[in-house]
């Protein structure tokens, strides 16, 4: 009986001694810090204003992997100015709805190689939505500046 009591007290003492006595909050695990992606004219190989496809010098798959880590706005800096602001990077895997300008990575139409498109909303079935139409008008000036700049430096594909 005495041995059981001693064993119980040792077990209780060991359990209590191994508990942490500080109240510090556990820090969340994160990988790399999330940054907004910025593209410059040196990143863009060409842009097709008809289809709105943008071809980057970087490999599509590695660029797609990097962009998946971003959260929020993407910027196209041409010269010293931010010419075009994109609300989000989306892919064919995305089930969310966006009613503002997005950079869409399309892998369904060509499974061997994905393509990037600048679209006014995602998915495109919401193109006639009132909020999308308002944002199209709001972004018209950005689009004009973006296309004029790319024309000036010879990066428009027709």
PLM feature spans:
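Positively charged n-region of N-terminal signal peptides that target proteins for export
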Residues: 1-5
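Sec-dependent N-terminal signal peptides
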Residues: 6-14
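C-terminal motif of bacterial Sec signal peptides marking the signal peptidase cleavage site
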Residues: 16-18
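A structural signal for conserved, well-ordered secondary-structure elements
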Residues: 22-158
């Amino acid at each position: 009986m005495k041995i059981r009591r001693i064993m119980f007290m040792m077990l209780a003492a060991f359990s209590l001694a191994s508990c942490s006595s500080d109240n510090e909050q556990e820090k969340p695990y994160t990988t790399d810090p999330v940054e907004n992606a910025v593209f410059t004219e040196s990143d863009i190989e060409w842009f097709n204003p008809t289809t709105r496809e943008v071809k980057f010098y970087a490999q599509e798959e590695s660029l797609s992997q990097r962009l998946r880590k971003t959260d929020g706005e993407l910027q196209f800096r041409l010269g010293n100015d931010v010419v075009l602001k994109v609300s989000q990077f989306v892919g064919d895997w995305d089930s969310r709805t966006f009613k503002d300008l997005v950079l869409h990575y399309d892998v369904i139409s060509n499974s061997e190689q994905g393509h990037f498109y600048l679209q006014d909303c995602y998915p495109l079935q919401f193109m006639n939505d009132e909020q999308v139409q308002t944002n199209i008008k709001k972004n018209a000036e950005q689009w004009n500046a973006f296309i004029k700049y790319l024309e000036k430096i010879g990066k428009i594909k027709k």
